[in-house]
Amino acid sequence: MAQLADGRPKDSGQMGLAARYYAGEIGTEFGAYLVNYHQRIPSLSLVKTPSGFDNSIFNGLAVAGQNVVNPLSYFFDYSQENIQVAGFSAATELFGYSVFGELSYTKDYPVSYNTVDLIKGSATGDGPLARYGDASQFPMGSVLQGYKPLDKIQAQVSTIALFPRRLGASQLAVVGELGAQMWRGIGDPLTGDRFGRSPAFGAGSH
């Protein structure tokens, strides 16, 4: 497949706002923030390249004069705009340990499809992303988006403890972290779209 120019978001519209408050009576700092930003980590997206377009070598096989594999080109896609994050944090000290936690909600984060499913579905019309191979929905020249905007809630708690003069060092730091994410719209990977799975494990069978 030929590589096309990267898909880029607009240059404007990114902003953030944060506030902090230290509650001295309980020795805890509280924080809150709001962020609106554009995609920073690219997804792999495809374009159905017309079969006579020479910059794609993925021109398919011909049977009875018809292509049985859709010709494709690819590009690195940074185009998701207005990813919104709202978060709340707290930091304190308990029993000599520094403890801090954060709870955040992210809206419209671009989650990449399994790349094997994406290419197979777009080229042959098979697998979880078979819709991308449907010429009635996605004719030649269509952009086949390699991600889906999804919402998530993330919570994490971390701690740091410092011990002077341990194990021959001037200071030993012990760090621990516990976190969890809950996504909305992921669905069942056995029957629907699949996200983030390594392409080394092949394509979906459904």
Task: Label each PLM-derived region with a short phrase.
Residues 1-42, 46, 88:
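Aromatic- and glycine-enriched pocket-lining scaffold segments that form the walls
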Residues 1-3, 42-75, 113-144, 185-205:
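Solvent-exposed loop segments that connect transmembrane elements
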Residues 11-15, 82-86, 149-155, 206:
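Residues that define the transmembrane beta-barrel architecture of outer-membrane proteins
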Residues 17-21, 32, 88-92, 101, ...:
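Residues on the lipid-exposed face of transmembrane beta-strands in outer-membrane beta-barrel proteins
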Residues 22-29, 93-96, 164-174:
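Short loop/turn motifs that connect adjacent beta-strands in outer-membrane beta-barrel proteins
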Residues 23, 34-40, 94-96, 105-109, ...:
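Transmembrane beta-strands of outer-membrane beta-barrel pores
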Residues 28-30, 43, 99-101, 157, ...:
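Transmembrane beta-strands of outer-membrane beta-barrel proteins
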Residues 150, 156-206:
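Substrate-recognition/cap regions that form aromatic- and gly/pro-loop-enriched pockets
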